[in-house]
């Protein structure tokens, strides 16, 4: 309780001892599950870090390709494979310059593209090959088709593939780790949650049983409405607190985005989002309100499910 700001081993020991004495009745034994939760949270933070790296590498590659093969990144929209590879990236690695396509005849390119799809195990479409060839005839590159340009692009492709591979490895490892948690089955049943967002949610929320009520978990996420009262004054519309975990709020917004895109008509959170949007509420208002409702449902379902399990688990 000193006014001085002291940082030493002795002062730290006193703080830890005081905390233990104050919280003695509430402290629980550290378990293997706590270690798994800490590992999952660390993996999630690494996942976020490498996702930023992947985005930066992707933008870097697109910027270079705009000088050799503009728009090639828009030809395919298939998601990344389990090894991190993407069709448009592999295509750009092979056909790194517009002259790689238009210097061939249409039949020669179609045949070459078909063999490439077979070798890379991608679906082949003759109409797609004709579309690519037709667009290539209209493009004007800036950089020449030589070994220097080729090396620049191949280096950018390798960097993106490396980051993408790490992201997919972490995604798989996080799902495998989260599957060991008792709440995994009930969380994965919720709309808007899948093998990627589910583990991220469990990583950031942690052990639900440590929250005493629904308001505690929404406050932890920072999606609870703020309070501004003094005497007889009471502000009606107060922004959310945003005092909690920013990473959890980001994950919740991604879940809300999935709900809006998939539109599950029988889902209460989606119905709530639709209602708020119909009322003309701003984007951040209805997204935050939806996240609040989702967390309350998450808390109730997980708490009920855990209480139904045998005590040994």
Write out the residue ranges for each language-model feature.
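A detector of single, family-specific signature residues
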Residues: 1-313
């Amino acid at each position: 309780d000193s006014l001085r700001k002291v940082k030493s081993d002795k002062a730290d020991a006193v703080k830890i001892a005081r905390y233990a004495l104050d919280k003695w009745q509430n402290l629980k034994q550290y378990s293997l599950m706590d270690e798994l939760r800490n590992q999952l949270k660390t993996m999630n933070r690494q996942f976020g870090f490498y996702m930023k790296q992947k985005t930066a590498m992707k933008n870097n590659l697109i910027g270079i390709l705009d000088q050799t093969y503009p728009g090639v990144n828009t030809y395919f929209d298939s998601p990344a494979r389990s090894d991190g590879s993407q069709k448009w990236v592999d295509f750009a690695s092979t056909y790194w310059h517009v002259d790689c396509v238009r210097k061939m005849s249409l039949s020669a390119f179609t045949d070459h593209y078909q063999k490439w799809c077979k070798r890379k195990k991608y679906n082949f479409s003759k109409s797609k090959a004709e579309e690519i060839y037709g667009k290539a005839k209209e493009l004007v590159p800036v950089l020449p088709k030589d070994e220097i340009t080729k090396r620049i692009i191949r280096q950018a492709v390798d960097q993106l593939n490396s980051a993408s591979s790490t992201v997919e490895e972490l995604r798989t490892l996080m799902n495998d780790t989260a599957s060991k948690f008792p709440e995994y089955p009930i969380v994965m049943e919720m709309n808007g949650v899948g093998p990627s967002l589910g583990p991220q949610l469990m990583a950031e929320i942690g052990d639900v049983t440590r929250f005493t009520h629904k308001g505690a978990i929404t406050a932890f996420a920072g999606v609870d409405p703020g309070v501004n009262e003094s005497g007889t004054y009471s502000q009606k519309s107060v922004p959310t607190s945003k005092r909690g975990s920013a990473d959890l709020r980001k994950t919740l917004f991604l879940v809300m985005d999935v709900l809006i895109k998939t539109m599950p008509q029988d889902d209460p959170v989606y119905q709530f989002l639709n209602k708020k949007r119909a009322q003309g509420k701003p984007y951040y208002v209805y997204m935050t309100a939806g996240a609040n409702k989702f967390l309350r449902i998450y808390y109730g379902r997980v708490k009920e499910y855990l209480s139904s399990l045998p005590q040994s688990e």
